[in-house]
Amino acid sequence: CSSDLKEDKLMHSNLIKDWRNGMQHNIPVNANFTLFNYLNVTPSFNFTDRMYSNKVTRSWDEERQVEVSDTTYGFHNVYNWNLSLSASTKLYGMYTGSPRLFKKHPWQIRHVFTPQVSFSYAPNFGSARYGYYDTYQKTDANGNVSLVEYSPYSNSLYGVPGKGRTGSISWDVSNNVEMKIKTDKDSTGFKKISIIDELGASMSYNMAAATHRWSDLSMRLRLKWWKNYTFNMNAVFATYAYELDENGHPYVGNHTEWGKGRFGRFQGMSQNFAFTLNP
């Protein structure tokens, strides 16, 4: 009986009015190329498009004190997009030392410096120009008036893009320092010694934030002085300095630590040893 009922509804239903339907497609565009022979550039662009056959407009019935919905049918296109761009390169420094320090074996120190900058952006799809969000005025039984925000596409199959503009610029630097000593004991003729496997730092700037746009400074250190052991350490330094309010109570203000001639406020650190078993 249940199966026959579903089949009967299916055969006599209206595809647009009786079914929750929609179509969505995603278009990612990515590339990777080298600029000026040294700069690695990676741009990307993502576009998401949703197509709906209806939208729901809401209003407030003051007499009945209920929300009223009105569904209108037609073609509605709801899209959003975002883009990003990253660029990185590697800079090498070499230092050749005196062989007298290592029993007349030639040795060399190599420093690899890897800076990277990234940019990402997405517009505010909650803006009135897109029409993805709307408002109506609500007056309750006590005469209190409020503005209710909603999206005509919130119950649609693929939803609606989020509100708010996003945009950030991120920086990251990484350092690697290793030594090579000429030796007859290695088949390559050289023995590599890791001095600093990685010493790095990262930070970002939120262009869409109203205040405190700079993130905290994160630093990391990795050492591999022994074959199977790795030492990791991470530390965080706060960007914004403490200030005092009118009552003398401290709070995080809008002035940076480096603006006051300081490196940053130490927030904490973590460290660990890792041991790797070779088969």
Report residues per predicted region.
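Outer-membrane beta-barrel translocator/pore domains, especially the C-terminal barrels
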Residues: S3-P279
